């Protein structure tokens, strides 16, 4: 009896170890190339609108994949999908490294990496629920969450060091480390019974087309792309109303509180992601810092602060309530952007503090947005609704990166608007920061109103 129990515990612990490895590298893959975007732009002689697709391509397939893998898990089995994700992620890494001298191949490789990496966040939580005993799940989720935060933290530092001292292309090989988990997962994960079901492939294709063409519009500003995107989304909406098992539940669209909360959350996440993608360009143009200095000295402290702010935010929600935390988070974000706009050419360490403010504000607002959205859902809508929120969060990050890249390239905001004496190289960035602050304030006011109304109706 004791031997059987100890063997079962050992098996669960081994599963948890390899899940932690996958979780860490999935986030690292997302963050590690961000600091190298200016280097990539210079090497290929590309504008930020094109160079940012190195991250946008990954986030696009990553966001769609996270939604798709969850729906496929019962039909194809978690074990098969995890192994598929690991191998595809590794394949994308090798293609990217071998063909890194050709920009189209690099973008293709990032699309492939996103397809593979999406399996990890989508399925890891399901594996914990199925394989880890109920009494240990809290610790398991906590450990995975800590490693995810660590991956977000060390990603920019690793990216900066490797890009500066070796070459950014070697960062593409980092995800291949997950291949070491394959033999252990094959041995540890049980074979599952498959459940027959229907996958709304038409809905997935229509929605993906709408997203891709909208992102292409934000980077090229060709209105033909916008028209195609609108048509694709229109057909998609008509489709999900008639489909037997639609990719997105159309009933969620009738929930005004849910829709507004999700859209505002997406705007905030996209704004912060766009800001983080802009920081390397800004620090190179204004302060002429190296990639290593930007990664470890500017972005790294902010990403690591997420661990502390996440804990503080959780305590404050319990003690002071969601509205209090929302206001503090929005204040940190908007004030951080405004201070950066007015002191953009001051000492670089000021930007380090601002990045800490921004990531702290993001931690606080993420908690509140999840609370607002979940409180607007009925019990039967909770699963589909929260999955759609996660999908929107990932997608908005990629969209934010694409939009910021487009704005940095067209020079629309490259004019002096603030009454301060600064160098011409700062005009574009300071105006972008003012725009970011405005978006945050508007979202704060809207979410505040939605939260109060949902509480009144709840």
From Swiss-Prot:
**Any Pfam family hit:** MFS_1
Q: What domain of life does the native source organism fall in?
A: Bacteria
Q: Tell me one GO biological process term.
A: proton transmembrane transport
Q: This protein is called what? A: Tetracycline resistance protein
**Keyword Transcription included in the entry's annotation:** no
Q: Name one GO molecular function term.
A: antiporter activity
Query: Which parts pass through the membrane?
Result: 12-33, 81-100, 111-129, 140-162, 165-185, 201-221, 223-240, 256-276, 297-317, 324-344, 346-365, 432-451
Q: Indicate whether Transport appears among the record's keywords.
A: yes
Q: Which organism is it from?
A: Bacillus subtilis (strain 168)
Q: Name one GO cellular component term.
A: plasma membrane
Q: What does this protein do?
A: Resistance to tetracycline by an active tetracycline efflux. This is an energy-dependent process that decreases the accumulation of the antibiotic in whole cells. This protein functions as a metal-tetracycline/H(+) antiporter.
Subcellular location(s): the record lists:
Cell membrane
Main localization is membrane
Q: Which UniProt keywords apply?
A: Antibiotic resistance, Antiport, Cell membrane, Hydrogen ion transport, Ion transport, Membrane, Transmembrane, Transmembrane helix, Transport
Name the PROSITE patterns for this protein.
MFS
Membrane topology annotation: Multi-pass membrane protein
The family note in this entry says: Belongs to the major facilitator superfamily. TCR/Tet family.
